[in-house]
Swiss-Prot record:
Membrane topology: Multi-pass membrane protein
Record text on subunit structure and interactions: Part of an enzyme complex containing four subunits: a flavoprotein, an iron-sulfur protein, plus two membrane-anchoring proteins, SdhC and SdhD.
The protein, known as: Succinate dehydrogenase hydrophobic membrane anchor subunit
Pathway the protein acts in: Carbohydrate metabolism; tricarboxylic acid cycle
Main location: membrane
Upper classification of the organism: Bacteria, Pseudomonadati, Pseudomonadota, Alphaproteobacteria, Rickettsiales
Periplasmic side stretches: 41-62
Recorded name of the encoding gene: sdhD
Length: 120
């Protein structure tokens, strides 16, 4: 008998382990981003807004802040999906709420990216 690894991968992907893994990976990335965010906050706590805005225009800080916000919202989207799937019994309402949460996160990430690169 030949063991079918592809079938096991597909079964695992549909069983929730993929979602579980995404939650853990985004959580680890958020923990690392939190270290940067705490450092950035503590080093700029006595600065005025102009200096902080100048610091945020540095490429490393721009990328770090974009990653932090995007991963935070994606992590929240994954978590909200689990909560909605577990506690909303009406299928139509459940699917509607999941789509609303996903759209909210995508629009918020897109608006944040535009705001970070807006030079007004």
């Amino acid at each position: 008998m030949v063991y079918d690894f592809k079938a096991e991968i597909v079964k695992a992907k549909n069983s929730g382990s993929h979602h579980w893994l995404l939650q853990r990976v985004t959580g680890i990335i958020l923990a690392l981003c939190s270290i940067w965010l705490i450092y950035f906050t503590l080093t700029n706590k006595n600065n005025d807004i102009n200096i902080i805005m100048w610091e945020l225009k540095k490429p490393f800080n721009v990328v770090a802040l974009l990653i932090t916000v995007a991963i935070s919202l994606y992590h929240a989207m994954l978590g909200m999906r689990v909560v909605i799937e577990d506690y909303v019994s009406c299928h139509k309402l459940r699917n509607t709420l999941i789509v609303i949460v996903q759209l909210f996160c995508i629009v918020t990430i897109a608006a944040f990216v535009v705001a970070m690169f807006y030079r007004g």
